[in-house]
Amino acid sequence: MAELAPRWPDAQHACVALAFDLDGPTGDAMLNGSIWRKPAYFTLGSYGPWRALGRLLDMLATFDVPATFFVPAWVAQTWPAQCAAIVERGHEIGYHGYRHEAFWTLEPARQREIMAQSAEILARTLGVRPVGFRTPSGDWSAATVDVLREAGVRYSSSMRGDDRPYLLHGENGEPPLVEIPGRWETDDYASLAYHRNPDYPAGLDRIAGYAATLDNWTREFDGVYREGLCLTTLLHPKVCGKPGRIALLEAWLGHMRAQDGVWFARCHQVADWWLAQHARDAQPIPRSDR
């Protein structure tokens, strides 16, 4: 599989781009209004920015690892001081909708409205203009790539099509987005988010053992490292940022840090590097109907 291995900066062997979705209490229950009748759901989500985020930022500082946080603008608006700490401590902010809207259900005009609203809030609240996007809900519509390009986005971390970054071309012939695919195998919801009181997600399995989760995640990294690829996570502070789970993350980061030749990078650094290495592939595609 050597032909699949990208060239990483400074002859590094593999890449790790830690990414967290700071959803807070946004999502379906907020969008349909039911969250306001279920305080337990709200507090389950608000734990992320209110309590877990600071713990995760301290952990990242201990291991000297940068990260990217995809933040719904409503969360930045509601917890500005907590979200400002992300920027102050040297990490990246990416777009993640306003209230975690399902982009795949929205017309392009509505997607543009959400991107513009999010850009204004994040600039005013945090002083940043993100260049990255992770789609809320895990999918998007055929028009989304062009919507993102119009909004000044340079990369996405939304799709699942490779173990390396790749290029996404839109319909309008503009330069492509870099896609930095996250890995469902390292989505903490799959292992750590099933619980009761409230029963969410309803009817699903109980929480996995922490030792088994650490073993799974370690094997995922080891496979990426062996083949010289890129590991991008789908972690959620409200899920993984609790005291017992921080120990799990610390053990995982310690294992990754102990390996030689791992480039730990913010997602925008990965995207910029990938575009520089694949400039020929990044040229606009001519439209045959023009």
What is the predicted function of each stretch?
Residues 1-132, 137-185, 211-233, 241-290:
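Catalytic alpha-helical scaffold of carbohydrate-active enzymes acting on polysaccharides/glycoconjugates
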Residues 130, 196-209, 236-238:
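Surface-exposed cleft-lining segments at the edges of enzyme active sites
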Residues 181-203:
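Glycine-rich, positively charged active-site loop/lid region within alpha/beta enzyme cores that binds
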